Amino acid sequence: MEYQEDVFVGYRYFETIPGAAASVCYPFGYGLSYTTFALSDVRGGMNGAGEIALSATVTNTGLCAGKYVLQAYVNPPKGRIAKPAAALVGFAKTRLLEPNESETLTVSFAPYAFATYDDEGAVRKSAYVLEKGAYGFRVGENVRETVNVDYRYELDDDAILEQLSPKCAPTLLHRRMLADGSYREIACAPETPREDWRKLEGIPDEGQYPLENPDQIPGCAWIPPIKPQLIEVAEGDLTLDEFMSLLSDEDMARLLGGQPNRGVANTFGFGNLPTYGVPNVMTADGPAGLRIKPECGVTTTAFPCATLLACTWNTEIVREIGAAGAREVHENGIGVWLTPAINIHRTPLCGRNFEYYSEDPLVAGEMAAAMVEGIQSEGVGASLKHFACNNKETNRKDCDSRLSERALREIYLKGFELCVKKAQPLTVMSSYNLVNGLWASQNRELLTDILRGEWGFKGMVTTDWYTHAPQYTEIAAGNDVKMGCGDPAHVLQMMREGRLKREDVVVSVRRLLEMILKLA
């Protein structure tokens, strides 16, 4: 699936491409109200933190009480790199304003919020840049109904904000869209020859390892506990290094696969090494409320779906919903809630759009961060998913998302980046699909170089359930646990053959145990 529209997704397309605007009935950010509002004293400038601060006084000019969302958009200068005509850089929402009541709102953001990733070297290859020129700003109630801010962020020379290196470069993407609606061929990286993993490892077409008893996921039989116990690490009597030094390769291989359900859970668990007191931490979906086994007869709350939550533009409400849902999750004996989902509304045809927040990565990232903060405030782990580019449902285990590095970073990874840096979810779930020719679950540039190296992610990565990539390639890439079950024997075989480093296994086990200790 080629993302030839590049960064021109959603309103970025309709506000930029000539002739496209007429197709829009409801512009991005549009909302209904029982009252009317007016903006006054609109200002802009730099604050003491080196951020751009845009402010406006909002007055309720109608007859009913209401709230107003102040949305801030950047209008970048034209340059060597094609840019959307408008992009959201921040938003704020008033309290409930009575008729004739006013409130002054301020939206602050760093210049990085509107930087461009240069994947072709027009300014500086593999860097976030700001081309020289004047960057204008507008504020208002949607992308169309805005007023100009009498402030420009002006640069006499190009600025390099962050120098990175090429990651996840496309190998089979034919062209990319430009700001005038035309297309240009894109230079692709040479395709790296890869072995046919399934044939090599004897993996069946459905991507799952054959089990001796197909009706039961392999687990651990209960064995009377012996010392040491993981709780001794939690209580400070043992270091994690000391505890892990006593685990055999067989113990570690078992820990890196999903574990059987218990209680009301139906999406399996993590851990489950009773000999060493490692609990079986249960997981459960999902993005619209806790989903458990229907035959249990336990009812749960159906919270509004992610798209509806994003329509509130209210991160505090989303944070409270995350906390409320997490309390319900905890009451049902679940340790990790498999939410939020944060993929982009690239097309209305994606079957999981109800789980996703927005076509805009800033909205998605801010909402997801609030949700994660709410969930984890109650001692429950959040799982940020699906990392990354899960934008179709049919055949999503084998679909190859082919896109430029720029589109990947500015659109499809940006929400994940915002959420990770702001909220540090305990887990991230990699997606089924391939990203530029490599399954996301075995993509080291994505899971290690970008997620951990660039963004500073501290948690554990799991696969989505029953991915097609061999488990040992996933572990080597930084994907710690294979769900819903792994294959310990296969992992051990790859270790013996030298195709999987023991140190990679140790690192993944450490991340798993650190996650469990944070839940204890």
Describe the role of every protein-language-model region:
Residues R144-S165:
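Extended, polar beta-sheet/loop recognition surfaces of beta-rich domains
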Residues M1-E145, L164-A520:
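Glycoside hydrolase catalytic-domain context in secreted enzymes
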